[in-house]
């Protein structure tokens, strides 16, 4: 399962909630994400790696999926996907740019597209303070320009009460994993 959407849509919050609810579920694995950005906040789960080591791991084929966005590199270790053969559902906090690659490598893939209006994205991006002020408009343009379509895509509009949307994400994950 690939969870994607624009910056500020709330992917990390939804996945954090699902991770807490499904922590003891052996049929679900929340894949570790390696990022060339410092992990400064408590609500984002990733392993920090410098760009040189990331590039070496990428060249050695150590990532099952990887991509670049917003001046950073992101990767999911190849080993995270090994459990698919055992019937475990792997949940990846991914990018809209790798949906086709995930479909090709790890079919079938369910894609949860987390969205929110431009106004809400703008508000959240400013509130989290991770982006420079001038970067927010670029992220909003990217949000509008990258689309994901397909029979395997479920859109989750994340504008209302976090708990309601988080419960829906848990239901989707549970449905795929057979929990």
Protein language model features and the residues they cover:
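Conserved phosphate-donor/acceptor-positioning beta-strand/loop module used by diverse small-molecule
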Residues: 90-95, 105-126, 156
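NTP-dependent small-molecule kinase module
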Residues: 123, 130-131, 148-179
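P-loop (Walker A) phosphate-binding loop of NTP-binding proteins
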Residues: 6
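Walker A/P-loop
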Residues: 12
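Hydrophobic anchor at the beta1->P-loop junction of P-loop NTPases
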Residues: 3
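ATP-dependent small-molecule kinase phosphotransfer cores
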Residues: 33-90, 94-96
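Post-Walker A helix-loop "phosphate-sensing" segment adjacent to the P-loop in P-loop NTPases
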Residues: 20-30
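ATP-binding Walker
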Residues: 9
């Amino acid at each position: 399962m690939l969870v994607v959407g624009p910056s500020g849509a709330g992917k990390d919050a939804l996945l954090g909630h699902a991770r807490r609810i499904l922590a003891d579920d052996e049929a679900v694995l929340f894949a570790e994400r390696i990022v060339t950005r410092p992990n400064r906040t408590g609500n984002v789960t990733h392993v920090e790696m410098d760009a040189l080591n990331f590039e070496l791991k990428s060249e050695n084929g150590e990532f099952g999926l990887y991509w670049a966005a917003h001046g950073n590199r992101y990767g999911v270790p190849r080993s995270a996907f090994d459990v698919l053969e055992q019937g475990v559902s792997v949940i990846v906090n991914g990018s809209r740019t790798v949906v086709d690659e995930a479909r090709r490598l790890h079919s079938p893939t369910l894609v949860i597209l987390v969205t929110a209006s431009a106004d809400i994205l703008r508000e959240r991006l400013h509130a989290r303070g991770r982006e420079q002020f001038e970067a927010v408009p670029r992220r909003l343009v990217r949000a509008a320009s990258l689309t994901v379509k397909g029979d395997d895509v479920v859109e989750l509009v994340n504008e209302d009460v976090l708990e309601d949307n988080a419960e829906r994400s848990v239901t989707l994950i549970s449905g795929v994993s057979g929990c």
